[in-house]
A protein has these predicted regions:
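Beta-loop-alpha module in the N-terminal Rossmann-like domain of NAD(P)-dependent dehydrogenases
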Residues: 72-105, 116-122
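Rossmann-fold NAD(P)-binding glycine/threonine-rich loop
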Residues: 95-102, 115-135, 139-142, 152
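Short, ordered loop/turn segments at secondary-structure junctions
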Residues: 49, 91, 115-118, 141-142, ...
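A short hydrophobic/small-residue beta-strand
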Residues: 109-111
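C-terminal catalytic/substrate-binding lobe primarily of soluble NAD(P)-dependent oxidoreductases
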Residues: 2-8, 185, 189-445
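N-terminal Rossmann-like dinucleotide-binding module
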Residues: 1-61, 216
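Conserved N-terminal Rossmann-fold NAD(P) cofactor-binding segment
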Residues: 50-80
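Rossmann-like NAD(P)H-binding beta-loop-alpha module
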Residues: 137-207
Length: 458
């Protein structure tokens, strides 16, 4: 609650937090719009595969590209001794793992926007960060970090967390959507989408359930919440319906168990838009365990389920890169992540969208071949399932029926890729359901790094 005042102190002392940004797309551009308005922060370098595009985005938000070091050399960025925090915002999970591990080797804190990477190896990334004496954090502004924030608020206030999650526009047949069909579901023509510069594969990754699976995986691994055995349920409802929906089945809700992660649909089963939905937001449902607490809920007008036991706190929107500075400040000033894996509890695995043929090439989230499904980590490991974040560019060795999860044995994968090595290491070294609360919070180890950061001059 004191981040702004501490940032002003850093500004006054002439020792700002120095940022290196890898990837200058939409999220990064939104963050760049806020950098000049935030005291105590300096953007030191940008690395992007298309430097001219990065310069264009800087101009778009009113910044002079000549004032920044911009190149396509991410290795130079992570090695720069003046940089305190690396923001990984490429959206490419395989590349992101390489960038993050290199940043750790150079003793850089990391704010990871590429949740896809966290979903398939976040628990081990967190461990590697702790071993390096740095902080690894999910990015505030992306829904997983906001959910982690709400869960932490509830627990710090003494409330048991019954459920937490996000909203989504969902109907079951969306799971088969492809980049060719996506715009009809959004009410756009392909021409309108083209003129708007919209990426059909990226938008489809939200629609087909891949992003919700990825993001709730990150939430489970960071908070200790767990999925239902069959994955996400997507019950439809408004904000006011949340306390009633997010309670155990035996009490009239939809939850398999207390402590579940879930996604609420903004559409009825008939496809009708629900008023006052949580589509772009996040929520946490918590429990009043005593008559006194439940009476307090009633006295202060807290919206609950009919029993008065379950209540909800929520944000109806998230601001993407515009609020990423919260992570930068938390990591740079306090040495604390805004969400970080504390164990391996869930996984986002690749599921065939249609009958896939031998020798077909997988095209990853939002594409034509696979979508994501949230599963418990022990199921993923026990069945040798293929994580969605790695299901791209690999050839199928055998047919896979529509609706079936893919396994490692179904694909010809590159065993030498850094991301594959890390994932396979996690499968052998991190027990499913594990709870290692020290991950991502190496307070003693990172203290010298924080002191060195504070002593730097602009």
């Amino acid at each position: 609650m004191n981040l702004y005042s501490k940032l002003k102190e850093r500004e006054a002392k002439g020792s700002p937090i120095r940022i290196g940004l890898i990837g200058a797309g939409k999220f990064a551009t939104m963050y760049l719009a806020q950098v000049p308005k935030t005291p105590g922060i300096r953007l030191a370098r940008i690395a992007d595969l298309a430097p001219d595009k990065a310069r264009e985005n800087l101009r778009r938000v009113g910044l002079d590209p000549a004032q920044f070091a911009i190149s396509d050399d991410w290795e130079k960025l992570v090695a720069d001794p003046q940089i305190d925090i690396v923001i990984e915002a490429t959206g490419n999970p395989v590349a992101a793992v390489e960038h993050i591990l290199a940043a750790f080797r150079h003793r850089k804190h990391v704010v990871n926007v590429t949740v896809e990477a966290d979903a398939f190896c976040g628990p081990l990334l967190a461990q590697k960060a702790a071993e390096a004496g740095v902080v690894y954090s999910l990015a505030y502004g992306v829904q997983p970090a906001l959910i982690c924030d709400l869960v932490d608020w509830a627990r710090a206030a003494g409330f048991p967390v019954v459920a937490a999650g996000r909203g989504h526009k969902w109907l079951p047949h969306f799971a088969q959507s492809t980049p060719e069909t996506v715009w009809g579901y959004y009410g756009l023509t392909p021409e309108q989408a083209r003129l708007g510069g919209l990426n059909p594969k990226m938008f489809n990754s939200f629609l087909d359930g891949s992003k919700p699976a990825i993001e709730t995986t990150a939430v489970c691994n960071a908070t200790g919440l767990t999925p239902a055995p069959g994955g996400l349920l997507y019950p439809p409802g408004s904000v006011e319906d949340i306390p009633s929906l997010m309670r155990p089945r035996e009490e009239g809700g939809v939850l398999h168990h207390k402590g579940q992660v879930e996604v609420i649909s903004s559409l009825t089963a008939e496809g009708v838009q629900i008023p006052y939905d949580i589509r772009f937001g996040v929520f946490v449902v918590f429990e009043g365990e005593t008559d006194y607490i439940r009476r307090c809920f009633s006295e202060y007008g807290v919206k609950t389920d009919p029993s008065g036991r379950y209540a909800c706190m929520y944000k109806r929107w998230h601001l993407i890169g515009l609020e990423a500075g919260i992570s930068v400040a938390a990591v740079g000033l306090r040495g604390e992540p805004t969400g970080c894996a504390t164990g391996w509890r869930a996984d986002a695995v690749a599921v065939a969208k249609r009958d896939l043929r031998e020798k077909e090439i997988l095209d990853g989230e939002g594409g034509y071949t696979v979508a994501g499904r949230l599963v418990p980590a022990e199921v993923s490991l026990g069945e040798n399932l293929l994580p969605l974040g790695l299901a791209h560019g690999w050839k199928l060795l055998r047919p896979v029926a529509a609706g079936q999860p893919l396994s490692w044995s179904d694909v010809a994968f590159d065993a030498n890729a850094a991301a594959v090595k890390l994932r396979r290491e996690m499968e052998t070294s991190v027990a499913p359901g594990s709870d290692r609360s020290q991950y991502g919070q190496p307070q003693q180890a990172s203290a010298p790094a924080r002191r060195a950061t504070a002593a730097r001059s602009p």
